[in-house]
Amino acid sequence: MFTLLRCLGFGVNEPTNTSSSEYVPEYSVEEISNEVAELDSVDPLFQCYKHVFVSLMLVRKMTQAAEDFLESFGGEFDSPCCRVYRLYRHFVNEDDAPAWAIPNVVNEDSYDDYAYLREELDAIDSSFELLNEERELSEITDRLNALRFFPVSKTEALPVANVQEVKLISETYQLLMTFINYSDENIPSEMPAPLLDELGMLPEELGPLNEIEDIKPVAAPITLLSEFRASDNAKPLDIVEIIPDVSPTKPYEAVISGNDWMTLGRIIPTTPVPTIRDVFFSGLSRHGSPEVIQNALDEFLPLHHSIDDKYFQEWVETSDKSLDVDPCRIDLSVFNNWQSSENCYEPRFKTGALSTRKGTQTEALLAIKKRNMNVPNLGQIYDVNSVANSVVNKLLTTVIDPDKLCMFPDFISEGEVSYFQDYIVGKNPDPELYSDPLGVRSIDSYKHMIKSVLKPVEDNSLHLERPMPATITYHDKDIVMSSSPIFLAAAARLMLILRDKITIPSGKFHQLFSIDAEAFDASFHFKEIDFSKFDKSQNELHHLIQERFLKYLGIPNEFLTLWFNAHRKSRISDSKNGVFFNVDFQRRTGDALTYLGNTIVTLACLCHVYDLMDPNVKFVVASGDDSLIGTVEELPRDQEFLFTTLFNLEAKFPHNQPFICSKFLITMPTTSGGKVVLPIPNPLKLLIRLGSKKVNADIFDEWYQSWIDIIGGFNDHHVIRCVAAMTAHRYLRRPSLYLEAALESLGKIFAGKTLCKECLFNEKHESNVKIKPRRVKKSHSDARSRARRA
């Protein structure tokens, strides 16, 4: 026991290696010596108890056990055990000790002169989370060796005996060793009965025994590898290579799987891409007749069958027009032929599918007027910078997980140069395209075109309004190849640092089925937001939100300044159709930032209007201008006016349905016993596309294969019933009579290519190809017969 006290800093030996600057305590060494001598004068059995008691105190979690031991063996204030306890509590943690256990043995000011001892004492107090007995013994020994250098007077420092002399576990007291390596199995039977009773009353959380038992056995230890490896000439935070190790990426698997599995495949190339093949489909016991498809279309869209737009473009091109457009320049010398020379199959069903549009000056002007000009000004913002800062701060705290973000450097660096290499794979670009950097290129100049294929019209307005084609504004190839990889790297980083409830389904595999099925089933209300004129309604506020958020993601500031300054005012030219005009902050629908920028704007709007951190919100999905929020209780609507007054957007909240990206979401069981969120395409849009007017013999095989991939989810009666019910409620507000039968007939229609042609284009599809009529020369006999009849 005397040796133990000397290890704690007390003793009576002669001083060695002291300096004159050391603090002189107010008490004398003789007082401590008398107390130590009194402690050593007790009988051997009681000294054994003291050894156990001191060992308990050395384990930080056993403080309560030491107090219980004190009450049973020497609970009186003047007993030797009580004095040892007071001395220990004073040196280890004075703040936690009771008032009676703080004696004036050592002046508290002496700690200020020995900072190294303060650090050791703090380490004793904070690091007793021991995982096994071996580590416990080694740490106790290290701390005892550190405490040996604690001086107690100005002229003397009391040395401790050598490590060989410090024998906490002697042959006489084997009980101490067995107690330090304590467990239910190795408590000796000869231990005194009162001590056994006390041990049996100890709470389970006091010792590290439960932590040891909670450790699960593993087949092999996990090797911790460095996540990044720096190059010789790189800056400290540059990334050269991401080592494909499972352990650093394990926290990201859930968030990557809910967004883009191609990003995870870049980090771990052996990762399999998930599919819906694991979904359990019961199959169809019957197939409907293809003739019911027309009945289903007439039920939902009663006037579509009467509309044939074959000659609509001829009427537009040959009629007088009066357009109210913004300032633009028109080259009237440009004229393009709008007549089509393609030989396409004539569809059998009258679904209201639109014909292909040809790019002409008139079509370009009509599309530009609708998509780019006459921008609505609904917002009421007076200090754009302060509002942008507020919106971005709310977006960062809501969407970004700081624990995931800290794994990345502060900026996108040389490690992500692989995005440039992957982008040009298979493109074989001209080397001259890389001759000039972006700084000397005209980033503010865009080209323009219209989309020839129009989206299906899903409402009953086809007989009232002629749909306009969408427009595309795009850069030259050299600018696209230099800028797209930067935004791809930023998008990958964004998907890696999202919070668990946020999902951005994107990439080659649009993984809506990776949404958390448990969170989806726990949601009873779904907030679907339909933004109108989303691209052209964006103004300076959206411009600043994107710039500051992308800077936070690590895109270099020089590139962001160059890019967004060029987007303040841009020149757009459609030289093929002879139309030239300017735009300011609105979205360029074909540049490298279109999808990522729209997604950032959508998330910023949602975060500012709704409290997405509320536990009531179970999941949030954002993809471009589409969004869906699942909640337990209905979201408050008192701030939804901010979509219009603050963000200058026309927002509609049509239905309480799990619908996003033209897909209905339902949960389905899997063959492995789990469940998954299954996205099913909008049935009404599929039925309209069955009457496509642009299918010919050259593209039929690809068109047929795309349909096989689309209708794979309709191989189950439960899926068909659920989706048909949601579609009928969405468009009719009542049950449908024909939709289920029409969806059941899809499997029969696409059972084979020959049958598909017979069902959709006619029984003999070869004779159903458009053939230009040719003039037949009339014979003289025909002329004589007509004259005879006359």
From Swiss-Prot:
Superkingdom: Viruses
One Pfam family from the record: RdRP_2
Classification via CDD domains: Bromoviridae_RdRp
Positions of the UniProt region annotated as Disordered: 771-790
Keyword field: Nucleotide-binding, Nucleotidyltransferase, RNA-directed RNA polymerase, Transferase, Viral RNA replication
InterPro entries linked: Bromoviridae_RdRp, DNA/RNA_pol_sf, RNA-dep_RNA_pol_alsuvir, RNA-dir_pol_PSvirus
EC numbers on record: 2.7.7.48
Biological processes, Gene Ontology terms: DNA-templated transcription; positive stranded viral RNA replication
Reaction catalysed by this enzyme: RNA(n) + a ribonucleoside 5'-triphosphate = RNA(n+1) + diphosphate
Comp. bias intervals (Basic and acidic residues): 779-790
PROSITE patterns the record matches: RDRP_SSRNA_POS (PS50507)
Domain RdRp catalytic: 524-639
GO terms, molecular function: nucleotide binding; RNA binding; RNA-directed RNA polymerase activity
Family: Belongs to the bromoviridae 2a family.
Function: RNA-dependent RNA polymerase which replicates the viral genome composed of 3 RNA segments, RNA1, RNA2 and RNA3.
SUBUNIT field: Interacts with replication protein 1a.
Name assigned to this protein: RNA-directed RNA polymerase 2a
Native species: Alfalfa mosaic virus (AMV)
